[in-house]
């Protein structure tokens, strides 16, 4: 396996092979960033098709050529965080090498590939794989690439940036992949997200669906081919971070959130009641609420516990104005990403409602909170479980990577004693699916969703929603799945 680190053309004259180690010996190379995007390309690739998709704030390291799965991680040794994207046959390669890599993995996304690359039900059918191998020549390679791209125009665009590896080398790679797949044990690596092209003619979409039943937390679908430059660019060089999208959409919903967020208000009241039941009766000196939003839960905390100091935090600076009626010498507001901010040490309670599901690295946040809390401190929060908005996920393939109550408590148990956990399912009824979409938009919970609607897609969505999720005549349902957890610092 080859690894190369790529730099923007204006800053470097070359890319580095893994043999150069962690230092930069090429004149004009920029300093290494703290984080890297590790991209496992598909069969027959090199770095050429992807050099124009450099991420804006991470180093890009590309893996390709799977004649061997020897994985030299020298280039990755200095990074504090690694984000993995794998495409096509690279998904299998990544699934094999990542479990034993000890890399600081932050996120993993698989695009149009599976951990089972040669499989009648979960990958490329063996007969097709063997046919591709046995008949491979320059002409059949171009036919394969045409099928990979899905259209003549996409194929012509790909030819301008196509890899230049010889056909014999590509044949050797296919032979090696087949041999290694038959010899190596199946990987148990679990991906954060799998993205499936519904017009993929290389890895059949149904096979991808079957393969990912136990090996990913979230499935996203799009209407496109196996090689889709737009999808690859979105994941290699995203235009806006998910946190920025979250902030933008909640900011737009400030005016309508208090009226529409009925479930979130119900959850806030229950969370406050649970705190009253399970926390000591004495008054709290220092409390931090992250993700305070428009202040629904904040006001309940103030009335119920009267803390000496309450620090409100939210990703959206604009939420300060929604909370201005309660801001004073005891209640302050700190804008920013709670995962990155430093909260005051010696805090007695760190709490939130309906926020943690948006976090990229909740386990790291739990560790940070344990360091911030005083010796008798508590972390208490509500979040959402795997059944949350299951209707939207089933119909669009989009949604957050929700964690179960068991997964959350297992993560917390290393540092905290679990005081109380519970979960419930809340079903809201609406007159029609359009009201569901309006409700989601008005509460801002579309968050990181990038669904684009055409008239035909919207009509199909509404028809399927009414067919599948109509509990009674004239209404449709939307599921919320809140989880409540209170834990004490050990």
From Swiss-Prot:
Residues 249-490 are annotated as: Malonyl-CoA O-methyltransferase. Pathway: Cofactor biosynthesis; biotin biosynthesis. Pfam families: BioG, Methyltransf_11. Residues 1-248 are annotated as: Unknown. Converts the free carboxyl group of a malonyl-thioester to its methyl ester by transfer of a methyl group from S-adenosyl-L-methionine (SAM). It allows to synthesize pimeloyl-ACP via the fatty acid synthetic pathway. NCBIfam families: BioC. This is Malonyl-[acyl-carrier protein] O-methyltransferase. It comes from Bacteroides fragilis (strain 638R). The lineage of its organism: Bacteria, Pseudomonadati, Bacteroidota, Bacteroidia, Bacteroidales.
């Amino acid at each position: 396996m080859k690894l190369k680190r790529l730099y923007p053309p204006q800053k470097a004259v070359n890319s580095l092979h893994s043999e150069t180690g962690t230092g930069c010996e090429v004149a004009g190379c920029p300093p290494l960033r703290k984080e890297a995007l590790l991209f496992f390309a598909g069969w027959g690739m090199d770095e050429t098709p992807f050099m124009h998709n450099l991420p804006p704030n991470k180093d890009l390291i590309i893996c390709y050529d799977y004649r061997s799965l020897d994985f030299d991680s020298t280039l990755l040794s200095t990074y504090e965080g690694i984000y993995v994207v794998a495409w096509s046959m690279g998904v299998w390669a990544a699934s094999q090498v990542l479990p034993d890599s000890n890399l600081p993995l932050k996120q993993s996304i698989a695009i149009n590939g599976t951990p089972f690359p040669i499989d009648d039900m979960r990958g490329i059918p063996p007969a097709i794989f063997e046919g591709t191998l046995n008949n491979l020549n320059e002409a059949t390679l171009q036919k394969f690439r045409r099928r990979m791209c899905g259209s003549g125009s996409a194929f012509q665009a790909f030819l301008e940036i196509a890899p230049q590896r010889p056909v014999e080398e590509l044949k050797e790679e296919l032979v090696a992949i087949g041999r290694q797949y038959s010899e190596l044990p199946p990987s148990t690596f679990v991906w954060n997200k799998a993205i499936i092209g519904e017009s993929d003619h290389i890895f059949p979409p149904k096979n991808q669906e079957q393969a990912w039943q136990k090996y990913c937390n979230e499935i996203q679908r799009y209407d496109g081919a196996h090689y889709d430059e737009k999808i690859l660019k979105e994941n290699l060089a995203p235009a806006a971070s998910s946190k920025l999208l979250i902030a933008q959409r909640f900011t737009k919903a400030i005016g309508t959130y208090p009226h529409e967020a009925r479930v979130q208000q119900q959850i806030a009241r229950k969370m406050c009641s649970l705190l009253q039941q399970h926390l000591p009766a004495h008054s709290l000196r220092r409390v931090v609420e992250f993700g305070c939003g428009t202040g629904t839960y904040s006001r309940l905390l103030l009335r119920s516990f009267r803390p000496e100091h309450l620090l409100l935090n939210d990703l959206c600076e604009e939420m300060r104005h929604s909370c201005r009626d309660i801001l004073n010498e005891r209640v302050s507001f700190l804008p920013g990403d709670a995962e990155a901010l430093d909260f005051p040490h010696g805090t007695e309670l760190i709490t939130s409602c309906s926020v943690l599901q948006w976090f990229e690295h909740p386990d790291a946040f739990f560790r940070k909170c344990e360091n911030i809390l005083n010796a008798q401190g508590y972390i208490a929060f509500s979040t959402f479980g795997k059944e949350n908005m299951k209707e939207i996920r089933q119909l669009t393939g989009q949604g957050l990577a929700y964690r179960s109550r068991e997964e959350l408590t297992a993560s917390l148990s290393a540092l905290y004693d679990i005081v109380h956990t519970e979960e419930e399912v809340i079903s809201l009824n609406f007159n029609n699916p359009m009201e569901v979409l309006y409700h989601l938009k008005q509460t801002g919970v579309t968050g990181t969703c990038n669904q684009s609607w055409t008239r035909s897609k919207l009509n199909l969505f509404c028809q399927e929603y009414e067919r599948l999720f109509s509990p009674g005549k004239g209404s449709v349902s939307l599921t919320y799945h809140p989880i409540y957890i209170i834990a004490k610092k050990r």
